[in-house]
Design a protein with these regions (language model features):
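Small/polar-residue-rich loop-to-helix segments that shape phosphate-bearing ligand pockets
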Residues: 3-74, 92, 105-162
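Short glycine/serine/threonine-rich phosphate/pyrophosphate-binding segments
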Residues: 6-10, 55, 78-89, 109-113, ...
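Buried hydrophobic positions in well-ordered alpha/beta secondary-structure cores of metabolic enzymes
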Residues: 13, 46, 65, 75-76, ...
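Residues at the starts of beta-strands that form the adenosine-phosphate
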Residues: 19, 98-100, 200, 256
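Glycine-rich beta-alpha junction loops
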Residues: 50, 80-83, 105-110, 130, ...
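Active-site-adjacent helical/loop segments in soluble small-molecule enzymes
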Residues: 140-198
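Helical hairpin unit composed of two closely spaced alpha helices linked by a short loop
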Residues: 200-206, 230
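A conserved regulatory-domain signal marking ACT and ACT-like small-molecule sensing domains
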Residues: 214-306
């Protein structure tokens, strides 16, 4: 596995009895090392997305979806190496060619997207994305051929869009999904392809191995972007009662104080001033606008951090 593989994935694999070797900055470097290691130690190498049996096995996901959801219009599938979508698209197009197949690349690892529209393999120079499960630099030629034959469209989603998908699934569906798994939902949420309002769309959530620290960052940023948290840096006169008057303002605004830091020693401050960094729990865009207005009316100089 790459050295930056989430700890959850590493420990989970070890718990199943495997020896885990961490090598390289991305999948492709780990893959090259695995090939060498297998040759040097007389081991059998099973390719994670080019092995025909692996591809066929992943195609059964499509059979389950078609069995459970009648009259599917579109199926959206994350793409890393392309094994999952190759198997699924091959199965779907044999059963019902009318079903549209959409592949989703991470914008930070767009090799298959680039290759799909160029109709030839074009590797990425580098990859960087929170969706480590689809962070693949080099294109699989066999899978590209499957994709060109069976997939209707390939789109990309950036890390911000993937993070929004993770947060949506966590909050609305009560599902913990990794970046690679949330890419399909992100493509739907941000309308990366055309679809009718009444369309029946199936999205493949291909994994849940997300690092807890990464998840906490996504949640915190998501709360700020959805106007449910607000971070303010406020300058006030450093004298008894000043902080109480400021907190009274937030109480009157019905904003809950989550964290507060009081600094009177910063060299950027004038003598006699203090700087308050405060994080508030808020109830949306209009609530935050009201708080800004109240601070301006009370003549508190402030900067909002996002």
């Amino acid at each position: 596995m790459p050295e930056a593989t989430p700890l959850l994935k590493v420990t989970g694999t070890k718990a199943l009895g495997a020896e885990v070797i961490l090598h390289g900055d991305n999948y492709d470097e780990a893959y090259a090392h695995a090939l060498t290691y297998a040759q040097e130690n007389g081991l059998t190498f099973i390719h994670p997305f080019e092995d025909p049996m692996v591809i066929a096995g992943q195609g059964t996901v499509a059979l389950e979806m078609i069995d459970e959801i009648k009259d599917l219009d579109i199926v959206v599938v994350p793409i890393g190496g392309g094994g999952l979508i190759s198997g699924m698209a091959s199965a779907i197009k044999q059963i019902d060619p009318k079903i549209k197949i959409i592949g989703v690349n991470a914008a930070g690892a767009p090799a298959m997207h680039t290759s799909f529209y160029a109709k030839k393999a074009i590797n990425s120079k580098s990859v960087r994305t929170i969706a480590d499960g689809i962070s693949v630099r080099d294109v699989s030629q066999p899978n590209l051929e499957h994709i060109l034959e069976c997939v209707d469209e390939v789109v990309t989603v950036d890390d911000e869009e993937i993070a929004a998908g993770i947060l949506f699934l966590l909050e609305r569906q009560k599902l913990v999904v990794e970046g690679a798994g949330a890419a399909s939902v992100a493509a739907i949420m941000h309308r990366k392809f055309e679809f009718a309002k009444e369309a029946k769309i199936g999205a493949v959530l291909s994994g849940g191995n997300i690092d807890v620290q990464m998840l906490s960052v996504i949640i915190e940023k998501g709360l700020i972007k959805s106007h449910r948290k607000m971070k303010l840096v406020i300058t006030l006169i450093d004298k008894p009662g000043s902080l109480m008057r400021l907190t009274d303002l937030f109480r009157n605004a019905n904003a809950n104080i989550i964290q507060i830091d009081y600094d009177r020693f910063s060299t950027k401050l004038s003598y006699g001033d203090a700087q308050i960094t405060i994080i508030l729990e808020t109830k949306g865009k209009e609530h935050q606008a009201m708080i800004r207005e109240m601070l301006n009316e009370a003549k508190y100089p402030f900067v909002e951090e996002v």
